[in-house]
Amino acid sequence: KTYNVAFVSSTNTTVNIPATVADPNNQYTFNVTAIANNSTVPNATSVTMPNTIVRIEANAFKDGNITSITIPQSVKEIQSGAFGQMSYLTAINVDAANPNFRSDNGVLIEKKDSKEWVAAYPLARPDVEYTVPEGVYGVYTNAFQRASYLTKITLPASLKESPSTAEFNGYTSAQNLREIAVAAGNTAFKSVDGVLLSADGKKLIAYPNGKAGSPSTNPAYQGVTGQPNASVYKVPDGVESIEQAAFAQVNGLTAIELNGVKKLAKGAFDKAVKLRNVLLGPSVDTIEDGAFGGNNDLAAFDVDPANPNYAADNGVIYTKNKEELVLFPAGKAGEYTTLPTTKKIRNRAFYYAQKVTKVTFNSNLEIIDNDAFQATTKLANITFEAPAKIKTIGTFAFQGSGLTELNIPASLEVVSWSAFGSTKLKKVTVADGSQLQSINTGAFNGCKDLEEFTFEGSSTLNKIQADAFSGDDKLKSFVIPEKVTVLERGAFNGASGLETITFKQPATMTVIGEGAFQYAKALKRIELPSTVTTISKDAFNTCSS
């Protein structure tokens, strides 16, 4: 039998990846067809790939000292950021017979659907300027990721596409880049003072990461001790939209004057860490979810009172009717209480707000959207004012936050996928009369400090989904409410400290899913209700006690 496998790691200085490997008994042959995501070569000075490799995944060949690499003829796919952790890489070469890729003097170009794209620029290539060859159609997201020495990129007249995500554009994290120039005759883009705009001047596409703004003596722009001097950028006249990730990770600006901008796209200013002054003028009519995030010096937003769409409360942006909390400044410290009129906290509203410590939610709040409080590492406490009306907590809403205790109101109906995953929770209490229907996939996954999860009274809960409590190794006991009929795959997988499981009577449990209690090593005894009809494979695998 033959199987396909991926290269994962080697500690050799010279790494020669084999085309095939066999198991110790020579019963099976494995073709090496991929370089795995986050593959490591900590001691390597060179690596040779066989002509069986068809895919190179993101962050390949991490941690080594490799200066050049050759892509074999067989490679068909190279993921975004594939070489983004190869800090010493100066050249990406390509076998001349490869039909999908070529090298432009060490810069990787992909051939796709009869068009060419800049795919990856070597991080340590010593040139300070690079001119994209004429004929190239586009620049991929992360193409110039972490380019150490580049100060100027010139785009050809042929270039028509420069896509981005909510966190990255094609030039993000090229920290010394100060100018993106555009050749004459380009009908898709133009450059204004080194900043990439659409040809009509209505969209700001990308601001070079290392480009400084203009100095200012305006008292409003001056920082506190330890912060850099004011560096201000005024968006050019005519620009109506700041596109996705246009200022992502930009490190040379402290203030933005939006001028006549109407739209701020998702991630427009993501992790622009030195930004501390933002004024939203009356023209701004659209702020997409997570337009700002991770701006650690930004303590308050200013919104022009004449803006008909948005308003600020103590530096926090709301919709004009005060029903939706749009953005919380990531540098705002301490405690915060949402306005009494608030019904929804938007996607990524508090994203990477790492100075907020406590949030009190008004009783009328109904929805906390996806990623709303993700990575709020100092947020230790949240409180829902009574009578709480909260119904939905979205996907990854508090993932990676600093929460230590949680009281879930009876009104809550949905706890979404990984909503509280990887938090510091120690205790969770669900109120009597709970309307919670399901604890969704991974909702409390990886809560390594979780010791207690309690339902105070009646509950409508009918399902505990896959991996809901997986890896919660300090959880010692759990009482499953009587209306729960299904424990899905791996619900308590890896809850190694779990000693007792109790089914509240009259129990209605019918299905215990695959690996539901796998690696619950401390579980000594469980009394299953008579209603159970299905126990899937590995449900109690490695319950060694």
State each model region's role.
Residues 10-33, 42-55, 64-77, 87-107, ...:
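Structural signature of tandem-repeat unit edges
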Residues 2-3:
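N-terminal-proximal low-complexity accessory segments that begin disordered
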Residues 58-60, 80-82, 141-143, 243-246, ...:
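Consensus positions within tandem repeat domains that build extended binding/scaffold surfaces
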